[in-house]
Amino acid sequence: MTFVADLPASASVFGKSLAVRETTIPGLLEVDLPVHGDTRGWFKENWQREKMVAAGLPDFHAVQNNISFNDAVGTTRGLHAEPWDKWVSVATGRVFAAWVDLREGPSFGAVYSTEIDVSRAVFVPRGVANSYQTLEADTAYTYLVTDHWSPDAAYSFVNLADETAAIEWPIPLDQVEISEKDRAHPRLADAVPVKPRRILVIGSSGQLGRALRASYGEHDHLEYADRDELDISSPELMSARPWRTYDTIINAAAYTAVDRAETVEGRVDAWAANATGAANLARVAAEFGLTLVHISTDYVFDGELERAYREDDALCPLGVYAQTKAAAD
């Protein structure tokens, strides 16, 4: 069943307050944008991170802005589930937009639709198939994305005319311009579900890594890597994995030979694994918007306090191993 939002074409685009609303698709958010107009035209803040995050929008990290200009009324594109988040809006004109959730899980197949004019934008999470149909000539459809376009990016698709999704297009699909590629997309029953981003456990051959593997088990969304497969101290770590396909990194890797860390060779290895590696992972997580789980140790304190240590206590490491872990913290 399709849910259609009530936005008549004659509604004024002016005078709205910034507002973020949930929809029938989890994570798909509809946003009202304040538009300011006068005799010269109008102005809007199409994306303003501080205000919109405070209003409830995810703090996404856009890296590319695309614009699709459409000459004619009825131009119809979709449905494409892309491997990144999107922030869609229009700079001119108006569209009817529809989405189908293709993410693996209980919301697969959920549908939502609305009209987008210059006073409305929509946040589209990764794995939700996107489409639109122009309702005015010379419509400029614009969108921010959280990853750079690549010919190797993995998409999933569903047909615009799918009977299960039953999208109520304002202009019948047999009367509009659709590419042959879009006409050939599969029905929902044959669409490929988009799997969740993966969790990467680093240091899987170590004591902690083995324990995590025994606890978590083997799943499609879990990946385990040891030093032979992924050297976190390498300056090439940033390009060592398609990091946008991950959600979380659990760093279970560590140089834990406390006595050997006091030797010349051990100091080098301890600093590389414990400090440089952790710093490299932090850079990766910051660059790609990932969650990084870092494991500390009580060795970062000297043990002289008479009470239990807290996370905000001043670091006071004694040996090399402790110093490298404190540097990582």
Q: What would you call each of these model-derived segments?
A:
Residues 2-116, 136-138, 147-153, 157-196:
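Non-catalytic, conserved peripheral segments adjacent to functional cores
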Residues 196-218:
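N-terminal Rossmann NAD(P)H-binding glycine-rich loop of SDR-like oxidoreductase domains
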Residues 235-273:
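NAD(P)H-binding glycine-rich loop region in Rossmannoid oxidoreductase-like domains
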Residues 219-240:
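Adenosine-cofactor binding site in Rossmann-like domains, unifying the SAM/SAH pocket
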Residues 202, 225, 249-253, 292-297:
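SDR active-site strand-loop-helix element
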Residues 268-277, 287, 300-329:
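Catalytic helix-loop patch of NAD(P)-dependent Rossmann-fold dehydrogenases
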Residues 118, 126-145:
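Ligand-binding loop in jelly-roll beta-barrel domains
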